[in-house]
A protein has these predicted regions:
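Conserved metal-binding segment of the jelly-roll/cupin
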Residues: 83-96
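Generic protein-terminus/edge-of-domain signal
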Residues: 1-81
């Protein structure tokens, strides 16, 4: 895909009532050694890597190739966090941030910028937080397809396109949360143990106790209960 940056998307009061309004969406490929941001970066979003910037919107970025660094106010301006292909990060309105690709690799990035009460509520409820802005999601075709669909909808700008974009933002946030959460559990073998527990409970739900399930998994009951609740929500 050629680099595409769509700026100043039309947003009207009805769009805001929907709960999410999209301001910008796009894709760009930064080749190794290329300046960042590129010189054709829209003035509304231009920034210096050294000085960073503050936006008045959320942006969800997805890096599909390459590597680089990310910094934000909450985690510390002097702290550069490694970013690589298969990671997403969320920028928050009013939050200083800076990010850039490694000169040796460049990177490919998708992004979508948005505002609205829907996302504000997710932040207020603790699903997304300034102190956890990065997500390990790996490379997924469904995420790439969503960004591509958003770009196509924004190019066409047919009647109701903002509502289509709002639905895509919802789905992208859901997948960022889902893939990152499961990545954390898989790294600690939690997913495997919980899967075993669910099979035991399903097969012997009339005769097996939670304490027995914990014992078969070589876990203390308190540890099993805590882990099961974190994974399933129950």
């Amino acid at each position: 895909m050629a680099s595409v940056h769509l700026k100043y998307l039309a947003v009207n009061p009805v769009d805001l009532k929907w709960g999410t309004a999209v301001n910008s969406v796009g894709f760009q490929e930064i080749a190794p050694g290329m300046d960042y941001p590129p010189r054709n970066h829209p003035s509304r979003y231009v920034f210096s890597v050294a000085s960073g910037r503050i936006l008045q919107e959320y942006q969800l970025l997805y890096i599909t190739e390459g590597k680089g660094k990310f910094s934000c106010e909450t985690l510390g301006r002097s702290k550069s966090i490694p970013v690589k292909g298969g990671m997403m990060f969320l920028l928050f309105p009013g939050e200083w941030h800076s990010y850039y690709p490694d000169k040796s690799t460049g990177w490919k990035e998708y992004w979508i910028g948005f505002n609205g009460a829907f996302v504000d509520n997710l932040v207020q409820q603790g699903f997304f937080s300034k102190d956890r802005p990065l997500f390990k999601v790996n490379i997924h075709e469904d995420i790439v397809n969503l960004y591509t669909s958003a770009i196509n909808a924004a190019v066409a700008q047919e009647s109701g396109f903002q509502q289509v974009l709002a639905g895509i933002v919802d789905r992208l946030l859901s997948l960022a949360y889902f893939y990152d959460r499961n990545s954390q559990f898989q790294e600690s073998d939690t997913a495997n143990k919980i899967s075993q527990a669910k099979v035991m409970i399903h097969s012997h739900y009339m005769t097996i106790s939670p304490e027995e399930v914990a014992a078969k998994l070589c876990l203390s009951y308190s540890s099993f209960r805590k882990t099961f609740k974190e994974y399933t929500g129950f």
